[in-house]
């Protein structure tokens, strides 16, 4: 069953037509429209020169070098029995990446509508994610169900910051995210979510989204100081291996577009590094 779902992801599923995404996990209207909930767009800028190729002997050395060459970023990769992380590795707001465990929790509870999952995961629709949260009972019930999927980070029952979702403010380190993604294919209720993660959204073709066949979810929003953060987690192909990756960026300028560019630059170096990458432990949803 899971391998069949993987083939669907690999082949590429037709993108759903409904798309309504807001910048960050700001509370959205119950029935959002594309006009009321604008999608993030890649910034218009002059092409930057290619970043230097990182030379390293192993994944730890590679990640340390990549993080050092990209200040303000964090990166982690995980395999069946290993995890490596560098740069900003302390817990940061999960933003919309938390919609993945939320959707899985809804799938397990039997309250996940396929279209709602597609909107919440592929297009990062906040109203759709809120629907899943409420379908789980909201508050403590939804937080506990979602936290059981994550297994590590604590999911708030109420929004710690006004105007933002409770689940989006889950503090989730990149290392724990990478480990979470590495095990996704072995978990119950993940097939529809992995399929939605594998559908390309033109508005999110940066960072991991620039790698062909990536199965990923992104999140973004303003930190408490107002500077925008952007992060992604997913399964990607590196050196012939299916690798679980989690990345984070916060631009010194505070600009969301710059944070996007930082993730893209980091991913270019990640893809070019010639090291032995660890295979994800569970690859049913792999590229």
Describe the function of each predicted region.
Residues 91-111, 120, 245:
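Active-site SXXK
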Residues 167-225:
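A conserved catalytic-loop motif detector
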Residues 2-10, 15, 22-64, 112, ...:
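Structured C-terminal helix/loop/strand segments within mature extracytoplasmic catalytic/sensor domains
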Residues 130-188:
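Mid-domain, small-residue-enriched loop/turn segments at the edges of structured enzyme/sensor domains
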Residues 78-80, 106, 120-125, 132-136, ...:
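Active-site-proximal beta-strand/loop segments in catalytic clefts of secreted hydrolases
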Residues 104-111, 134, 179-183, 268, ...:
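Short glycine/serine- and small hydrophobic-enriched flexible loop segments
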Residues 52-88:
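A short, well-structured edge-of-sheet supersecondary motif
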């Amino acid at each position: 069953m899971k391998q069949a779902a993987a083939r669907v992801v690999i082949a590429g599923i037709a993108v759903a037509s409904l798309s309504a995404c807001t910048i960050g996990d700001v509370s959205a209207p119950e029935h959002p429209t594309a006009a009321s909930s604008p999608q993030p767009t890649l910034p218009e800028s002059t092409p930057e020169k290619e970043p230097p190729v990182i030379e390293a002997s192993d994944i730890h050395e590679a990640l340390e070098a990549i993080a050092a060459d990209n200040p303000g970023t964090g990166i982690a990769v995980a395999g069946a029995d290993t995890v490596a992380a560098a740069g900003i590795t302390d817990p940061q707001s999960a933003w919309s990446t938390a919609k993945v465990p939320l959707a899985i929790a809804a799938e397990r509870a039997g309250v996940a509508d396929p279209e709602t999952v597609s909107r919440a995961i592929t297009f990062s629709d906040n109203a759709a994610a809120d629907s899943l949260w409420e379908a789980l009972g909201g508050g403590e019930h939804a937080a506990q169900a979602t936290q059981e999927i994550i297994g590590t980070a604590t999911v708030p029952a109420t929004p710690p910051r006004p105007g933002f979702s409770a689940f989006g403010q889950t503090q989730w380190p990149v290392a724990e995210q990478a480990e979470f993604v590495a095990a996704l294919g072995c978990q119950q209720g993940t097939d529809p979510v992995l399929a939605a993660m594998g559908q390309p959204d033109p508005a999110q073709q940066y960072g991991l989204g620039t790698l062909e066949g990536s199965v990923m979810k992104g999140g973004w929003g303003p930190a408490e100081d107002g500077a925008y953060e952007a992060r992604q987690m997913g399964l990607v192909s590196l050196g012939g291996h299916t690798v679980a990756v989690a990345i984070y960026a916060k631009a010194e300028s505070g600009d969301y577009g710059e944070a996007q560019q930082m993730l893209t630059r980091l991913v270019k170096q990640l893809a070019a590094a010639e090291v032995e990458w660890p295979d994800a432990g569970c690859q049913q949803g792999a590229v």
